[in-house]
């Protein structure tokens, strides 16, 4: 008997569950041990699968790191889309910390993991997907600034959007690498910097 078209194949369900378990185990082991200390044996053991099962989906640690980074990007896009929607009725002064707080909050949720991702992904050629997500974010920031032309004094909103996205991203990544994501001053300082730049 053929299963209903909307029902997932049990084999696919098991495969998805295995991949999810391995990714979460990899995240936990990377958080605890860092990239050098994380072994595929430890990850497989934490996930409750054999090393052979792990290698079916991920040939090495690099592929695991890239998959975790992809998961981060998948969380980033809808989270930031929601933040921009919430910011529509806010003033520039209120909207900027709300938006930056959304980004920083994602990194703060798992700081040790994001430290590994920030350090390792550039060496693993994860740039194409990063550029795609950054392009979407840049378009949102550009529209955000254009909608607040009366509050933004920068003469070139397109350039300003690029500078803001690049600066906030670079400083957040630096905080991740240096273990400073949880510092209370991070969000206020980023907010102060961006507002000063946009107001000229």
Briefly describe each language-model feature range.
Residues 106, 143-148, 165-183, 195-200:
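Amphipathic C-terminal alpha-helical segment
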Residues 74-78, 94-109, 125-150, 158-162, ...:
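Amphipathic alpha-helical packing segments from all-alpha helical-bundle domains
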Residues 1-17:
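N-terminal intrinsically disordered/low-complexity leader segments
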């Amino acid at each position: 008997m053929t299963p209903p078209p909307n029902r997932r194949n049990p084999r696919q369900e098991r495969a998805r569950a295995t991949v999810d378990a391995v990714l979460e185990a990899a995240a936990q082991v990377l958080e605890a041990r860092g990239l050098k200390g994380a072994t595929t044996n430890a990850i497989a053991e934490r996930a409750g699968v054999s090393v052979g099962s792990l290698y079916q989906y991920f040939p090495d640690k690099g592929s695991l790191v890239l998959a975790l980074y992809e998961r981060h990007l998948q969380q980033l896009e809808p989270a930031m889309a929601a933040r921009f929607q919430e910011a529509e009725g806010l003033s520039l002064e209120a909207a900027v910390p709300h938006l930056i707080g959304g980004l920083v909050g994602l990194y703060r949720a798992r700081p040790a993991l994001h430290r590994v991702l920030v350090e390792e992904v550039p060496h693993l050629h994860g740039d194409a997907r990063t550029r795609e997500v950054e392009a979407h974010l840049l378009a949102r920031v550009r529209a955000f600034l254009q909608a607040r032309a009366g509050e933004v004094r920068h003469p070139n909103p397109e350039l300003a959007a690029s500078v803001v996205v690049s600066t906030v991203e670079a400083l957040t990544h630096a905080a991740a690498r240096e273990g400073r994501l949880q510092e209370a001053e991070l969000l206020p300082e980023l907010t102060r910097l961006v507002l000063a730049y946009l107001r000229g």
